[in-house]
From Swiss-Prot:
GO cellular component, one term: plasma membrane
ABC transmembrane type-1 domain location: 70-261
Claim: Transit peptide is one of the keywords in the record: no
Gene label: dasC
Species annotation: Streptomyces coelicolor (strain ATCC BAA-471 / A3(2) / M145)
Major localization listed first in the record, in broad terms: membrane
Subcellular location: Cell membrane
Descriptive protein name: Diacetylchitobiose uptake system permease protein DasC
Record SUPFAM superfamilies: MetI-like
Alphabetical keyword list: Cell membrane, Membrane, Sugar transport, Transmembrane, Transmembrane helix, Transport
Keyword Methyltransferase listed: no
């Protein structure tokens, strides 16, 4: 039975409206960053910038400690993602391949940790960091970001490991590989989509995190970009062009990562949910 014209059109119209609603704020942020100040404060909105200027980006990048915030964000984010992947590879393999007492309890524990609201634990984390004399340090940020990422990473990679036929691993071991060599040469290459999807999730989570760094790092030398952006009125006042330029610079790494990995990341998330 053929669907009516409305039945064929409305899903597309809805998708277009949602797309515009989601993309327009991002477009407006980048467009404002390139507009001259006169166009930004004009009573008549300038939808498409014609006079392109990079002055706002210069103002943002020349702000105090800007590059310190950038380097701090990159350090804690990359380290947290890499450490979580290394640990998750071992943990996901153990949960998917090995049978041991308490295995289901571990899986339930990781699920509960994934659902836990980390914001309510900020005060407890602050007390731990304070008692360890590690305030205003990047080390606790890296460790706790890794803990935030780890449950999702383990559960997702577990699905990928479980989907790899055991016969492939056994064939490699028959050919003379140890179990570690079989994992590295056979299983690890097949986990590439899962590694990409979990890497993207971990990068976005750590890159955008604010409550923890707001509490444990009070000195500018140990703060990250999200905290710097929250103080834009103090830094830039009413200079909305510089504010949008700073926000654009903050968003660019995530956009690049998403565009580069989005196909494999989406296929990785769906494939990792099939079996496990």
């Amino acid at each position: 039975m053929k669907r009516s014209l409305f039945g064929r059109v409305w899903p597309n119209v809805t998708a277009v409206v949602l797309f515009i609603g989601l993309v327009f704020p991002v477009y407006w942020m980048f467009a404002t960053a390139f507009k001259p100040t006169g166009d930004i404060i004009s009573e008549n909105p300038v939808w498409f910038p014609t006079d392109i200027t990079f002055e706002h980006f210069k103002t943002a990048t020349e702000a105090d400690h800007f590059w310190t915030y950038v380097s701090n964000s990159l350090i804690v984010t990359v380290c947290a993602v890499v450490f979580s992947l290394v640990i998750a590879l071992a943990g996901s393999f153990a949960l998917a391949r090995m049978r041991f007492k308490g295995r289901r309890g571990f899986i339930v524990g990781f699920m509960l940790a994934q659902m836990a609201p980390w914001e309510v634990m900020v005060i407890a984390i602050y007390m731990i960091v304070r008692d360890a004399s590690m305030l205003n340090s990047l080390v606790p940020l890296t460790l706790f970001y890794m803990m935030m990422i780890l449950p999702f990473t383990i559960l997702t990679l577990r699905g990928f490991v479980a989907a790899v036929p055991k016969e492939l691993e056994e064939s490699a071991m028959v050919d003379g590989c140890t179990r570690a060599q079989a994992f590295r040469r056979v299983i690890l290459p097949l986990l590439a989509p899962g590694l990409m999807s979990t890497s993207m999730f971990g990068f976005i989570t750590a890159w955008n995190e604010l409550p923890l760094v707001l509490v444990v790092n009070k000195e500018a030398e140990s703060q990250t970009l999200p905290l710097w952006l929250t103080s834009f009125q103090t830094v830039f006042g009413d200079n909305w062009g510089a504010t949008m330029a700073a926000s654009s610079l903050f968003a660019i790494p995530i956009l690049i990562l998403f565009v580069y990995l989005q196909r494999k990341a989406v296929s990785g998330l769906t494939a990792g949910a099939v079996k496990g």
